[in-house]
């Protein structure tokens, strides 16, 4: 398996940012780490081993980035007005810098056109991944979200403004009209949203998202695993093994 490390100064964030790439060829996957996570968590917490069969087979290439959660979602002593705006800086970093980097690497690997990217994450990483998928369906055409929450006000102590709204699928999706141009993109794309029902899981958020998607006619596989399925890496590894082959099918 090919592994590469890159770092560059991010204009969006005003600092150096790091990224690690695993694999060569196949579907590009943007991995968003769990809360407060770093780019090396994909490897250090064992998620690399869960993806290894797909990476070794040339079916996928994973790009693992840093979060900015310590300045945004987790910064409980900060002003939520500024925390959510810092989060938007991070979103611009992903869309304006990381996605072009992914496309550049894909061209090096032989892609003739810009491929769609799978957004993938667990826990708060799933929250961010789902938001990327629903906000930017031109860039992100597949989603694997495990054990996420989809109401952004949860991360900002109930605070709500236009920026929180833009990052909260449970708020913006209900207001999308059925003829919104994104609707056709959602229908072409593929999404898997999975939630356990055991300790530390919050299935209510997924159930509400499930209801909204059905109401809007937005296709997605929304799967609820058993009451023994905890909010834990060992279960996310099992879910990756189960769902990734389905997402990688042509």
Model-derived features: positions:
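Non-catalytic cap/lid and distal C-terminal segments of serine-dependent acyl enzymes
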Residues: 1-250
């Amino acid at each position: 398996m090919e592994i590469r490390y890159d770092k560059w100064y991010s204009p969006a964030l005003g600092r150096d940012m790091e990224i690690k790439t695993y694999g060569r060829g196949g579907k590009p996957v943007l991995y968003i780490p769990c809360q407060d996570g770093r780019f090396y968590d994909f490897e250090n917490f064992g998620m690399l081993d869960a993806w290894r069969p797909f990476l070794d087979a040339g079916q996928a290439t994973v790009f693992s980035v840093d979060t900015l959660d310590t300045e945004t979602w987790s910064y409980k002593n900060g002003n939520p007005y500024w925390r959510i705006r810092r989060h938007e800086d991070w979103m611009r970093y992903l869309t304006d810098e990381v996605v072009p980097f992914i496309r550049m690497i894909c061209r090096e690997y032989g892609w003739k056109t810009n491929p769609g990217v799978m957004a993938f994450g667990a826990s708060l990483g799933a929250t961010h991944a789902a938001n990327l998928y629903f906000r930017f369906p031109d860039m992100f055409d597949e989603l694997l979200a495990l054990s996420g929450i989809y109401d952004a006000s949860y991360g900002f102590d109930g605070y709500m403004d236009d920026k929180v709204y833009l990052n909260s699928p449970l708020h913006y999706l209900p207001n999308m009209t059925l003829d919104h141009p994104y609707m056709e993109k959602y229908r072409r794309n593929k999404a898997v949203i999975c939630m356990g029902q055991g300790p530390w899981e919050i299935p209510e958020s997924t159930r509400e998202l499930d209801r909204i998607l059905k109401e809007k006619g937005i296709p997605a596989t929304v799967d609820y695993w058993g009451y023994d399925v905890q909010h834990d890496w060992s279960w996310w590894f099992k879910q990756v093994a189960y769902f990734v082959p389905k997402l990688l099918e042509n």
